[in-house]
């Protein structure tokens, strides 16, 4: 019973870490990386489709992405979608190839992105703590139903806290890596 609660908690906490990674990928650094465009949705035959499903996104150099659409008629739609996204990118089209140069980040922009990264990290910490709260409530319910002893409850609470500390440390590590990445010039 307690092992089920712990494994469920650990699984939910790891999902919070994965979500944090996804959010961090959407925060642009000065370097070109295809995952920056993961959230861009292109109008493709009337429906919103992820850019990765209508084109090939590659890195040309440290500051430029190259987008090769699979159909030539979708080039203007891809351009429009990139400009509409809040990434601050301006695509340049040459024939059926779209180049997306990454503008240098200003100090002000970097600080804004760091602030956003910290907010995302705090959100991940909160969701991890909510998982801990739910797990502890389940353990308390087991004690109340006299399915486990109070000693088992204390032991389980300590183990759940250790799991929580491990995942909060992962969040902190991911945040410091993202901050370092953002401050690189």
Swiss-Prot record:
Key word Cytoplasm present: yes
Pfam family, one: RRF
Keyword line: Cytoplasm, Protein biosynthesis
Main subcellular location of this protein, as a coarse class: cytoplasm
Keyword set includes Transferase: no
Cellular component terms per the entry's GO annotation: cytosol
Protein origin, superkingdom: Bacteria
Location in the cell: Cytoplasm
InterPro entries linked to this entry: Ribosome_recyc_fac (IPR002661), Ribosome_recyc_fac_dom (IPR023584), RRF_sf (IPR036191)
UniProt xrefs under CDD domains: RRF (cd00520)
GO BP of this protein: cytoplasmic translational termination
One MF term in the entry's GO annotations: ribosomal large subunit binding
Family the entry assigns: Belongs to the RRF family.
Listed NCBIfam families: frr
Matches recorded under HAMAP family: RRF
Protein role: Responsible for the release of ribosomes from messenger RNA at the termination of protein biosynthesis. May increase the efficiency of translation by recycling ribosomes from one round of translation to another.
Protein name: Ribosome-recycling factor
UniProt lineage: Bacteria, Pseudomonadati, Pseudomonadota, Gammaproteobacteria, Cellvibrionales
Gene: frr
